Amino acid sequence: MSFDFDKIIDRKGSACIKWDGMEKFLGSADALPMWVADMDFLTPAYITEAIALKASHGVFGYPLREDGYFTSLMQWLQRRHQWNVERDWITFCPGVVPAVNIAVLANTLPGDKIIVQPPVYFPFFTAVTDHKRNLVYNNLVLRDGRLCMDFDNLETLAADGAKMLILSNPHNPGGSVWTRDELLQMAAICLKHNVIILSDEIHCDLVYKPFKHTPVASLSQEISNHTITTVAPSKTFNLSGLSTASVIIENSNLRRKFNLQLDHLHIGGGNIFGNIASEQAYLHGDSYVDELMDYLGKNVEMLKKYVAENLPNIEVIEPEATFLVWLDCRKMGMSDEELNKFFLYTARVGMNPGAMFGPGGEGFMRMNIGCPAITLMQGLHQIKKAFAFI
């Protein structure tokens, strides 16, 4: 099977945040959207056809999450990541961000310290502060063009009474695929100080060769018993609008507390199309993901080459995973406000300002390259032309 990732899909007017929410969320509708983390590719036909078949039935009552939802995910995780998961460990949740918030509510108390590792996916911050927990930072370190964990500081924070670590694995926005050794070192610190590991693995399928994703909970049973993992087909298969994710918890006590909180909030029902899409994605998605990663890999190479030849004041932090690229723009000598205005209004390219990802994000921008190559090249040309106005 072959997928046409070069095909241009007109998303304007489709009520999508990425294209139709530019004015509301970024402040300009007159820019090329290369920001929010969904792709401009068609969802695979075997998914859309299954949704259409269900829609043709014409009745959309309360859905039953059947065996296929669970077994397809279990088989996918074993096939793609060599992680053996049991059905009882899996809980549905309407999105990874809700799952992170529920895990915080279920396992910590107001005033508890929770570690995050910025620059990182910004909803992690509000998942802590919205619930009156205390946010503590273990800032990542940019070393040889890669964001790395500071294990000495992590040890200090864990020893100081932190109750939970929220991990982005693989990392968003930096694209680091944490190695087995890095994860073992991180987990050893957390186990030593009884810190729960909340591992957001939504980007786990989007890893470039030769790197390999390691689920934290696959490292050992002891580590698994201290870990809550979130996964979803949304980034991989462009299904974010269907609000479907899964939470995997081996520890029965942690799972009981999570499910109790989920039940109290009455948000565990899900939607009929999300169930179908998730099952089809995990049953039939191997060739799609393989071809997608080959295409995205070519986009990365195109980006690196163009920036090296034309944009000397920008450095690409080469991603090991995700369709999101962390751009080091500090040599441009601009404040964060000036940087955002330059790209949004002068270059007319809408990206996420690095500062929104917390400490360490200052002077950076996050670019979404999950688009046809011609769209990526258009954005790069616009940025090059904009430098003439500096």
What positions do the PLM features span?
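Conserved core of the PLP fold type I
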Residues: 60-188, 205-206, 213-218, 222, ...
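Structural signature of PLP-dependent enzymes
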Residues: 256-262, 281-304
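PLP-dependent enzyme catalytic core of the Aspartate aminotransferase-like
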Residues: 155-156, 223, 335, 342-351, ...
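Active-site C-terminal subdomain of aminotransferase-like
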Residues: 222, 253-273
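N-terminal small-domain helix-loop-helix segment of the aminotransferase-like
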Residues: 2-95, 102, 281-284, 390
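Conserved glycine-rich beta-strand-loop-beta hairpin in the small C-terminal domain of fold type I
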Residues: 279, 295-304, 316-329
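Active-site PLP attachment segment
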Residues: 219-257
